[in-house]
Amino acid sequence: LTPEEFEQLIDQREGETLDFKREMPSSSDLAKLITAFYNTHGGTIVFGVENGTRRLAGVPSPQGAETGIVNIIRDRCSLDVMPTIEFVSYGGMQFVVVTCPQGARKPYLVSGETRPYIRVGSSNREARLSRGAEERGS
């Protein structure tokens, strides 16, 4: 991303395809967010930006954050294609931007979970199966 593209990105509000994280969430929460993006319309996670206020905080160790993100994806997500991870310098700070495509082989699950997560507005929700699917044992 160019600085101009990054600025346009952080000027947007969180929603179905955009999530801001001031710092690294728990591995479970990040896995749910990533798989929810894959199961819905794809999306972008910007690390180093406070959600709600959009205050820029930066990421102290972008390479360390990338390693953590990759490990969580490898250990907790059942993905067929890895998201794109970029480092962005802006305003004298470093940010990590993770771009998740819409998945082609849905549903994507978090390891140990039996139901997929989807993105609804700016939150992740467990997808509900239709009554017919539940009765069939799907």
Per-region residue spans from a language model:
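Conserved N-terminal catalytic/coupling substructures associated with nucleotide/phosphate chemistry
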Residues: 1-138
